[in-house]
Amino acid sequence: MANADLDKQPDSVSSVLKVFGILQALGEEREIGITELSQRVMMSKSTVYRFLQTMKTLGYVAQEGESEKYSLTLKLFELGARALQNVDLIRSADIQMRELSRLTKETIHLGALDEDSIVYIHKIDSMYNLRMYSRIGRRNPLYSTAIGKVLLAWRDRDEVKQILEGVEYKRSTERTITSTEALLPVLDQVREQGYGEDNEEQEEGLRCIAVPVFDRFGVVIAGLSISFPTLRFSEERLQEYVAMLHTAARKISAQMGYHDYPF
């Protein structure tokens, strides 16, 4: 896009386009100075410098020693690798989620950690009219969801506390956990038993069970869950549902390169 075209855009859009223009130019060279970069992207040196300093602060750009040359860091690679991992994960999970849906007829979710929340990255809707409302991309708290608990339970306690440090606990129901101190022993239990539960903690009338999915390094990268209206949930079948989830999660984890699924 020419610089004249950029100037016709609203300021916020123009700034974003300029940032991506700089990133693209940086990606074409191992390192590049401000003068050459400003000529390539057709912006003033002061504008390029301002954007570079912001990207440097955010960790996307590095300045080479005492020189005035700049280069991209691996942070963009990390973002791209994470996106590709999610694509592979969803592709691997889809078959197993559809089988779980066939066996249970209930809503099946795949959720991943995003900062201090879970985000649903894939789902299969229940075959019943009465079912949990959700959508791909929806965010929910870690502390009140079954998936959230399994995403935290296999992490170091210091990391868990760091993730939850800025979380504002909100009581959605009478059963909602409202502090990190109360959550930590629950996470110990989740790790020991191999699954997490949401017993009307996020929404009244809703019960969820979740198990972990591991990547090739043995790190929990997602939670796989079944969600039921409480009127359709049978406590006597809890372990049967857990076994179904473990079977599916074991196969997904194997597809992701992890063959020592612990349950």
UniProtKB/Swiss-Prot annotation:
Single GO BP term: negative regulation of DNA-templated transcription
Keyword Cytoplasm: yes
Residue stretches making up the IclR-ED domain: 89-258
Signal peptide per UniProt: none
GO CC, alphabetical: cytosol
Compartments where found: Cytoplasm
Paired cysteines (S-S): none
Annotated region of DNA binding: 34-53
UniProt keyword list: Cytoplasm, DNA-binding, Repressor, Transcription, Transcription regulation
Annotated GO MF terms: DNA binding; DNA-binding transcription factor activity
PANTHER family noted in UniProt: HELIX-TURN-HELIX TRANSCRIPTIONAL REGULATOR, ICLR FAMILY, HTH-TYPE TRANSCRIPTIONAL REGULATOR KDGR-RELATED
Function of the molecule: Transcriptional repressor that negatively regulates the expression of kdgT, kdgK and kdgA, which encode proteins involved in transport and catabolism of 2-keto-3-deoxygluconate (KDG). Also represses expression of eda, which encodes the Entner-Doudoroff aldolase, by binding to its P2 promoter region.
Protein name, as recorded: HTH-type transcriptional regulator KdgR
